[in-house]
Amino acid sequence: MTEQQTNGATDANAPQFSLQRIYVRDLSFEAPKSPQIFRQQWEPSVSLDLNTRQKALEGDFHEVVLTLSVTVKNGDEVAFIAEVQQAGIFLIANLDAASMSHTLGAFCPNILFPYARETLDSLVTRGSFPALMLSPVNFDALYAQEMQRMQEAGEVPTVQ
């Protein structure tokens, strides 16, 4: 009986991670040169900006938002601009500060990316443009680069 109570206490302090919800927080699409752009030779150049942010909610819940912004030019003209903010609510408990920072900064965005990529691709094809085939992103490497940049700048990472 004592063993069971001890195990129960240990389990209560064990790290917890659970995805609660995935949703589109914001979505936009602009094709400023349509319909003329559809009659031109298609020679696109793609620019992708990626950003993540997180916010502590009540209790052990956290919102993580992954933003993908794509600008595609055909020659010198902007063919389209598309942006998606893919968000998730995660239950994360009993992690040390470094593990919490890594989970929010790399692990959660890695979960959100396939949803954001599919939403962005669907948005672009509905605008009558060729599908975007975004390559997978190594969020662990991006997180490590950001931690190194912060360390060199003397900044302290914070979990909000």
From Swiss-Prot:
GO terms for cellular component: cytoplasm. InterPro entries: SecB, SecB-like_sf. GO terms for biological process: protein folding; protein tetramerization; protein transport. Its main location: cytoplasm. One of its GO terms (molecular function) is unfolded protein binding. SUPFAM superfamilies: SecB-like. Keywords: Chaperone, Cytoplasm, Protein transport, Translocation, Transport. It is found in: Cytoplasm. One of the proteins required for the normal export of preproteins out of the cell cytoplasm. It is a molecular chaperone that binds to a subset of precursor proteins, maintaining them in a translocation-competent state. It also specifically binds to its receptor SecA. PANTHER family: PROTEIN-EXPORT PROTEIN SECB, PTHR36918. Belongs to the SecB family. Homotetramer, a dimer of dimers. One homotetramer interacts with 1 SecA dimer. This is Protein-export protein SecB. It comes from Pseudomonas entomophila (strain L48). The gene is secB.
